[in-house]
Swiss-Prot record:
It catalyses: a quinone + NADH + 5 H(+)(in) = a quinol + NAD(+) + 4 H(+)(out). Belongs to the complex I 30 kDa subunit family. NDH-1 is composed of 14 different subunits. Subunits NuoB, C, D, E, F, and G constitute the peripheral sector of the complex. This is NADH-quinone oxidoreductase subunit C. The gene is nuoC. Keywords: Cell inner membrane, Cell membrane, Membrane, NAD, Quinone, Translocase, Transport, Ubiquinone. Its EC number is 7.1.1.-. One of its GO terms (molecular function) is NADH:ubiquinone reductase (non-electrogenic) activity. One of its GO terms (cellular component) is plasma membrane. It is found in: Cell inner membrane. InterPro entries: NADH_DH_suC (IPR010218), NADH_quin_OxRdtase_su_C/D-like (IPR037232), NADH_UbQ_OxRdtase_30kDa_su (IPR001268), NADH_UbQ_OxRdtase_CS (IPR020396). It is a peripheral membrane protein. NDH-1 shuttles electrons from NADH, via FMN and iron-sulfur (Fe-S) centers, to quinones in the respiratory chain. The immediate electron acceptor for the enzyme in this species is believed to be ubiquinone. Couples the redox reaction to proton translocation (for every two electrons transferred, four hydrogen ions are translocated across the cytoplasmic membrane), and thus conserves the redox energy in a proton gradient.
């Protein structure tokens, strides 16, 4: 395993070169961080270069770093993290890119390179609000079309903004402000008369 990682790391350093922002080796895995401006081009290189051969994209997920290290993190807030697999070389790589603008997180789409990125990018858009430039059908995939916000962002309220319920009078589903009834959070302890041998 170590020799294989050495080979992969050397190939990445040779092929990608000075476009590498970070190349971290931890727990038997490599994570390559690149600039947003180089993201799509490096993705294509990772797929097409014979020494790398990452022909399969396994997953893309969004990350919100605003609460990272208990709020002590001072870098860019949003990242898209892709997991790549090379079947021919039997190795994996994590590819990370940070969106340069926290107010409007935008990175290039990988769908022209790996068509399987389609729904993963839609999920990252829906959950984190990361916009993938060049995606041909970037719309919500997990939340309702009328949903407001992006629920996996650290600043999204746990209760949400609205709740939906079926209204029998209107005979349809309606949205209304969240109404959470206060409840007692102290657990009740019920003990028998002779609990633990005590009288």
């Amino acid at each position: 395993m170590t020799q294989k990682l050495d080979t992969l790391q050397a190939a990445i350093e040779r092929v990608i070169g000075d476009r590498i922002v970070h190349l971290v080796r931890d727990r038997g895995e490599l994570t390559l961080t690149v600039k947003a401006t180089d993201y799509a081009a490096i993705g294509k290189t990772l797929r097409d270069h014979p020494d790398l051969g990452f022909e399969q994209l396994i997953d893309i997920c969004g990350v919100d770093y605003s609460g990272y290290k208990d709020g002590g993190y001072e870098g860019l807030r949003y990242a898209a993290v892709s997991h790549l697999l090379s079947v021919q070389h039997n190795w994996r790589l994590r590819l990370k890119v940070f969106a340069p603008d926290d107010d409007f997180p935008l990175v290039a789409s990988l769908t022209p390179i790996w068509s399987g990125a389609n729904w993963f990018e839609r999920e990252a858009f829906d959950m984190y609000g990361i916009v993938f430039d060049g995606h041909t059908d970037l719309r919500r995939i997990l939340t309702d079309y009328g949903f407001i916000g992006h629920p996996m962002r650290k600043d999204f309220p746990v209760t949400g903004h609205v709740e939906m319920r079926y209204d029998p009078e209107q005979k349809r589903v309606i949205y209304q402000p969240v109404s959470i009834e206060p409840r007692e959070i102290t657990p009740r302890i019920i003990r028998e008369d002779n609990y633990g041998g005590l009288h």
